[in-house]
């Protein structure tokens, strides 16, 4: 009988065996679930930080739109009262970083301390690993270089939401980025000149840098990509002052990229002037070299400005500095405390250039 019944069971399986198989499956599933909980927790901590990392004045948000969702943290200084319209600085992190989690733009720049002293709002968007495995912003992807789409649309949406939610000054919204975030900041200056008054690139490159062959950069002149940046501005075209900070020893983004960026943005200004690349925009050049103080890196400051004194592009080329955000109080993997105070430089630049 037993043999007969066994032969009649589907696939020759005995009735008890599927139960043991299911029990093993449940055990394995349970183990996997338990393993995924800490992995998920660690991923969340990496990207969004831990509750006790929050400082006074910090608030977390998620921007939602048809384009997608974007997490970000806002820091409100003590001067914030909901009625006085304060300036805004959006700080965009680089690869292997987050906005306000582990190895964050928040700790790297120490903007919160400066904001508390000077009275401005800071915004830290953070990339999601499902968009980029090493948490880069996708500024080298042509699909992420246009208005109304992708990361530019999300970040501009965040900026607008902050202005509305916290009654910030829409004429004093600025963006600063590091590395891939610097590329995104330049893209935002081109695609949303009606949202961002100025842009800062720290260890970043020009709009459309992905079109430039590192082995033959001269084959793609800066005015070629500048025309594309200007065309992205559309009816909102205007001079968006750009600040560039670059380390001479940067092996990831070499100094030639910053040199190109300066020429590129000067060309954008030329196109904005009359739609032609014809030197119609007269620029006055000023160069200042700051010698090394004890324990500090020397640097050269270049300023290209209109005859009326408005900066078109300024750059800081820092000797003995690599692929970092410089500043005396920076805390993170990509910092150099011997460099000039980039956060203070960004703020001083922003103060001089509200949207006109």
PLM regions: where:
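A domain-start/cap signature at the N-terminus of enzymes
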Residues: 2-88, 103, 107-109, 113-118, ...
């Amino acid at each position: 009988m037993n043999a007969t019944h066994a032969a009649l069971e589907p696939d020759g399986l005995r009735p008890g065996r599927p139960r043991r198989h299911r029990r093993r499956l449940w055990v394995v599933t349970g183990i996997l679930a338990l393993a995924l909980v800490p992995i998920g927790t660690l991923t969340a901590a990496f990207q969004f930080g831990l509750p006790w990392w929050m400082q006074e004045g910090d608030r977390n948000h998620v921007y939602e739109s048809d384009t997608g969702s974007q997490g970000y943290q806002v820091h409100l200084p003590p001067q914030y009262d909901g009625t006085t319209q304060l300036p805004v600085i959006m700080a965009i992190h680089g690869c292997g970083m987050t906005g306000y989690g582990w190895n964050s733009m928040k700790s790297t720049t120490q903007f919160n301390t400066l904001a508390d002293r000077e009275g401005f709002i800071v915004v830290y968007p953070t990339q999601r690993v499902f968009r980029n495995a090493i948490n880069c912003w996708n500024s080298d992807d042509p699909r992420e270089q246009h208005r109304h789409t992708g990361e530019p649309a999300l970040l501009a949406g965040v900026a607008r939401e902050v202005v509305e939610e916290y009654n910030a000054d829409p004429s004093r919204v600025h963006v600063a980025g590091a590395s891939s975030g610097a590329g995104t900041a330049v893209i935002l200056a081109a695609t949303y000149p009606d949202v961002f008054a100025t842009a800062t690139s720290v260890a970043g490159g020009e709009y459309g840098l992905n079109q430039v062959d590192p082995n033959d950069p001269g084959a793609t002149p800066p005015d070629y990509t500048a025309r594309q940046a200007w065309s992205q501005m559309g009816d909102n075209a205007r001079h968006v002052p750009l600040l560039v900070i670059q380390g001479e020893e940067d092996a990831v983004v070499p100094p030639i990229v910053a040199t190109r960026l300066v020429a590129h943005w000067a060309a954008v200004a030329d196109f904005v002037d009359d739609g032609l690349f014809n030197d119609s925009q007269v620029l006055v050049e000023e160069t200042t070299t700051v010698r090394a103080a004890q324990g500090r890196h020397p640097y050269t400051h270049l300023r290209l400005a209109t005859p009326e004194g408005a900066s078109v592009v300024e750059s800081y080329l820092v000797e003995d500095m690599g692929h970092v955000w410089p500043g005396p109080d920076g805390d993170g993997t990509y910092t150099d405390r011997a460099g000039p105070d980039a956060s203070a430089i960004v703020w001083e630049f922003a103060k001089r250039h509200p949207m006109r």
